[in-house]
Structures are given as structure tokens and as C-alpha cells.
């Protein structure tokens, strides 16, 4: 058995003494005095910041929202079932932040940026604060590039630009999510990173959206942030900020991003629940006084950056649900006043089979034609006015027994215009095909057809144009202008298709 000599013991002790590092750590510790309904009240956290992360003894995390004289109100980021009265709470000294990286593309995550798709961990070397200040005035430039949605009604009459905030508003089951997801599908090959944030949705609905993205190949450039209806209110409140932080990461790396918030009504309800449990004074519709700031600080993060910052952009499409078409409720009016326009979806139009059920008359884009290519402006300039006049005339025609020939022709043209705006779900159209479609409708080529024949004729014409006149697409995509040459090619294709179509109908 080996024995240690005195000099060896002396040497070992000296080495240990030299290695000794006297480190004094100060931790901000408190005690739980009350816990329940996703809220904990803590005493003893004297030097905590508003919004600081705290950690409970059993591992649950929370955010300090109420800083009162005698206690601190914490919202829990979990169920908190194992937290006991009297247990210790430690302040972390950090504000809520998430890891960010390119590895998040194609993944489904929760509000804490943890993967929930069962495909393993996500490796990230950088992190971003969940809540960061919006770009200032000097950091921005005006919106001038179009963000094509693939939906004729939007791209022609309510255009959206890169860096814009456009609200999608309507009753439940009117196709709000379908408009948003179709916009994501249309970004394929456009070098746009998409973030879809599902707040308080049914798990089956989110699964359906994710399946559609996989089937259409959209998951390659999309991140899905999902907090279902059974998630704690804190996580539903945080989910949009997590999505915004991920989109900002790409925006500041000179990329174009699109973020969908589906929907902000649910986030406001989660925030109302948290605020009432924290005993904050309720205001209109029992929402807290700062619910406007909740949404304004989120939506102001969408921007088109200037050339010094790389000209990246973040386009936001928030969704808000209305009750029986009441857009004068608190949350709808708040978000309408923050955004750069709104797309109204009508339950009446949806039930009448007009889908997407966009009410073009009261929908508006405050960026307007600045976010359209010149070719679209040339062709679709008067289409919104024509549709508005048609809607007015149609309402009048219900009560008038006899109409003059001009009014009858205007009604017939309006019905065909409305028919060409119909599109099936997950079927976005490239801008060249949209221009051809609108040209046919506004120039009266559909007037000779029955309304039931319009869809079939347009489908066949688009295929015929692509197969026999590929130069048309090349001219529009390269020059962004509806040139005389493009018009001649389109007219030839229309005449050929009209002849073929009349022969088909005769046989």
C-alpha cells in the first residue's frame, strides 16, 4: 500500500490553496406567499426589475409584472402545480429572451422557442430579447416594394408592401386564416422568411395549417410559433413577441420577412385574464388600460429598413376576430388605428360562395399603389371603383323594377368581375396571371360568357397563355410594365381562347 510522504502532502495542500478562488455571489431571493390561477405573489424580491425573469425552486419560470410596495406579482410560464407556499424564488437578473438562428426554419416551436414538433433540439448561438424597441424614424424608409399575396382581390385593389402592417379582420369562420396561409404559400421562391404565430387556436387547426405548409413545400422558409387554447395565459401573451423577435433576427440580416399573428383578439383576452388576476383596474370591456400599448409596441416592430441597415423588411398581417361584424369594439378599433390598412372579410359574402370573402368596398391599404408594380397599376386602376359602383347599383336594383340598358350592362360586368376574384384555397396566382385575369374582366371580354362559364374560361386561358405565349410572362416579370407588346400577346391569346371556347360549347 502506497504511503504519502510529508513533502508530498505539503505540495498537494499548497496546490489546493493556490487553486482556491474566493467567489462571493449575491442572489436576490424571495418567498411565495400565494399561488394560483397562473399568478404567484412573492415577498422579499426588493431589487427586481419590471419584466424580469424569476425561477422557482421546482424549476418553473415566471415574469415579474406587478411591482407593489409589499409584494411582487409574478405571472407563471407553466402550470405551477408543484409550487408551494413558502418556497424560495430567485431573480435571474435577465429580461425574457429567446435563442435565434437559421436552424429554426421549418420547425414548430412554443412561445419559449422550445421545439414541439418532436424533431429534436434546435442549436442556436445567438439570442434576442423577446421585447425590443421598434426601429426609429431615421432607421426606416417608405414602403415601395410589393409583397404579392397571390390573391387577385388583394394584389389588385388592396396592395400590401414589404414593411407594411395590414389587418385581416372578420367574424369567425370567414376565411381569415386561409388568406394569411395563402400569402405564405405565395412567398415560395420569393426569398421571404415567414413566421406564423398561432395564439389560443385549437391544436387540430394548427396541425392542419402545418400539414398544408408541408404539402405545399412552404415549411422550408417558415417558422410556426404555436400556443394552443390550453396553454397558460402568460405563454399566449408572449407568443407574438417571440415570433416578432425571430422575424427581427432575419430582418436585421438584410432579409425580407412576413409575420402572421393569428389572432390578436386571443392575445388581448390572455392579457386581460393576467391583468385581472393581478388586480389591475379594468377599463373598457374589462381590458386593462395599457391594452393599446400591448398591440402598438408589437406592430410598430414591423418596418422597412433603410439602406444603411441593409433594406431588410418585416411585414405584419395581424388577424382580429369580430363579433357579428362589429368593428367598433375595443380591440378591432385599436388595431385598425395602429395598422396601415385593413382587409374586411364578410360573413354574408362567404355564405354566398364568394371566397375569399373580401369586402373590397370597405377594405383599404394606406400604402396604396406605391406597393404595386406598374403593370398592375395600369390594368387594375379602375377595378375597385367599378366594383364599388356595382355593389351600390346592385343594392338599388333590388328595389327598382326596370333598369335602363347602361345599368343592366354595368350589373352584368360587375357580376363577372366579382366572379373572376373568386379563388380556391391554397391556389395563389403569380402576378402575371393576375394581370391577365383583371385585363380580361375590365376590358369586357367576359361579357359574352355566362357567369357559370367564367371560371372554366379563365382557367383554360391562363394555361393557354402560359403554354403558347411565354413571352408575356417574361415581359411582365422583367420590365414590371404592361407594354404594348404584352397587350398584343394577351389580346391574341384571348381571341384564340374565345374561339376555342365557343367551339367547345357548341360541341
Curated annotation (Swiss-Prot):
Q: Keyword set for this entry?
A: ATP synthesis, ATP-binding, CF(1), Chloroplast, Hydrogen ion transport, Ion transport, Membrane, Nucleotide-binding, Plastid, Thylakoid, Translocase, Transport
Offer a single GO CC term for the protein.
plastid
What membrane topology does this protein have?
A: Peripheral membrane protein
Could you say which enzyme class this protein belongs to?
translocase
Organism of provenance? Oryza sativa subsp. japonica (Rice)
Self-association or partners: how does it assemble?
A: F-type ATPases have 2 components, CF(1) - the catalytic core - and CF(0) - the membrane proton channel. CF(1) has five subunits: alpha(3), beta(3), gamma(1), delta(1), epsilon(1). CF(0) has four main subunits: a, b, b' and c.
Q: Where in the cell is it found?
A: Plastid, Chloroplast thylakoid membrane
Biological function: Produces ATP from ADP in the presence of a proton gradient across the membrane. The alpha chain is a regulatory subunit.
Q: Note the InterPro entries from the entry.
A: ATP_synth_asu-like_sf, ATP_synth_asu_C, ATP_synth_asu_C_sf, ATP_synth_F1_a_nt-bd_dom, ATP_synth_F1_asu, ATPase_a/bsu_AS, ATPase_F1/V1/A1_a/bsu_N, ATPase_F1/V1/A1_a/bsu_N_sf
Recorded protein name is ATP synthase subunit alpha, chloroplastic
UniProt-annotated binding residues for ATP: 170-177
Look up the domain of life of the source. Answer: Eukaryota
Amino acid at each position: 500500500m502506497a504511503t504519502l510522504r510529508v513533502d508530498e502532502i505539503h505540495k498537494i495542500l499548497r496546490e489546493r490553496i493556490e487553486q482556491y478562488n474566493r467567489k462571493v455571489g449575491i442572489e436576490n431571493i424571495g418567498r411565495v406567499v400565494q399561488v394560483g390561477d397562473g399568478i404567484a405573489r412573492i415577498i422579499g424580491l426588493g431589487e427586481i426589475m419590471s419584466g424580469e425573469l424569476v425561477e422557482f425552486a421546482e424549476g418553473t419560470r415566471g415574469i415579474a409584472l406587478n411591482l407593489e410596495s409589499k409584494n411582487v406579482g409574478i405571472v407563471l410560464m407553466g402550470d405551477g402545480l408543484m409550487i408551494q407556499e413558502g418556497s424560495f424564488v430567485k431573480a435571474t437578473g435577465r429580461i425574457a429572451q429567446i435563442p435565434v438562428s437559421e436552424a429554426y426554419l421549418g420547425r414548430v416551436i412554443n412561445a419559449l422557442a422550445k421545439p414541439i414538433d418532436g424533431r429534436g433540439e434546435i442549436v442556436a448561438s445567438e439570442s434576442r430579447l423577446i421585447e425590443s424597441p421598434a426601429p426609429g424614424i431615421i432607421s426606416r424608409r417608405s414602403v415601395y416594394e410589393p409583397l404579392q399575396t397571390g390573391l387577385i382581390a388583394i394584389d389588385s385593389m388592396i396592395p400590401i408592401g414589404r414593411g407594411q402592417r395590414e389587418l385581416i379582420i372578420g367574424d369567425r369562420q370567414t376565411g381569415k386564416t386561409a388568406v394569411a396561409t395563402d400569402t405564405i404559400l405565395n412567398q415560395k421562391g420569393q426569398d421571404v422568411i415567414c413566421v406564423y404565430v398561432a395564439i389560443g387556436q385549437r391544436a387540430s387547426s394548427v396541425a392542419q395549417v402545418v400539414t398544408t405548409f408541408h404539402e405545399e413545400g412552404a415549411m422550408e422558409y417558415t417558422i410556426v410559433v404555436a400556443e394552443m387554447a390550453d396553454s397558460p395565459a402568460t405563454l399566449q401573451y408572449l407568443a407574438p413577441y417571440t415570433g416578432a423577435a425571430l422575424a427581427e433576427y432575419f430582418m436585421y440580416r438584410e432579409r425580407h420577412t412576413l409575420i402572421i399573428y393569428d389572432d390578436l383578439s386571443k392575445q388581448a383576452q390572455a392579457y386581460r385574464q393576467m391583468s385581472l388576476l393581478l388586480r389591475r383596474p379594468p377599463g373598457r370591456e374589462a381590458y386593462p388600460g395599457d391594452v393599446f400599448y400591448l398591440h402598438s409596441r408589437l406592430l410598430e416592430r414591423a418596418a422597412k429598413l433603410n439602406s444603411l441597415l441593409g433594406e431588410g423588411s418585416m411585414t405584419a398581417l395581424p388577424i382580429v376576430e369580430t363579433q357579428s361584424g362589429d368593428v367598433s369594439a375595443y380591440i378591432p378599433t385599436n388595431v385598425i388605428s395602429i395598422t396601415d390598412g385593413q382587409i374586411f372579410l364578410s360573413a354574408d359574402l362567404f355564405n354566398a360562395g364568394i371566397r375569399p370573402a373580401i369586402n373590397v368596398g370597405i377594405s383599404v391599404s394606406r400604402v396604396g399603389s406605391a406597393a404595386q408594380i406598374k403593370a398592375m397599376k395600369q390594368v387594375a386602376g379602375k377595378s375597385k371603383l367599378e366594383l364599388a359602383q356595382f355593389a351600390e347599383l346592385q343594392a338599388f336594383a333590388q328595389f327598382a323594377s326596370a333598369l335602363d340598358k347602361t345599368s343592366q350592362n354595368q350589373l352584368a360586368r360587375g357580376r363577372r368581375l366579382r366572379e373572376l376574384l373568386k379563388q380556391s384555397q391554397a391556389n395563389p396566382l403569380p402576378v402575371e396571371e393576375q394581370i391577365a385575369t383583371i385585363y380580361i374582366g375590365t376590358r369586357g371580354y367576359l361579357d359574352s360568357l355566362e357567369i357559370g362559364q367564367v371560371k372554366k374560361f379563365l382557367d383554360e386561358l391562363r394555361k393557354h397563355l402560359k403554354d403558347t405565349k411565354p413571352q408575356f410572362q417574361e415581359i411582365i416579370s422583367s420590365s414590371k410594365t404592361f407594354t404594348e407588346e404584352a397587350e398584343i400577346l394577351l389580346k391574341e391569346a384571348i381571341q384564340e381562347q374565345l374561339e376555342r371556347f365557343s367551339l367547345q360549347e357548341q360541341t
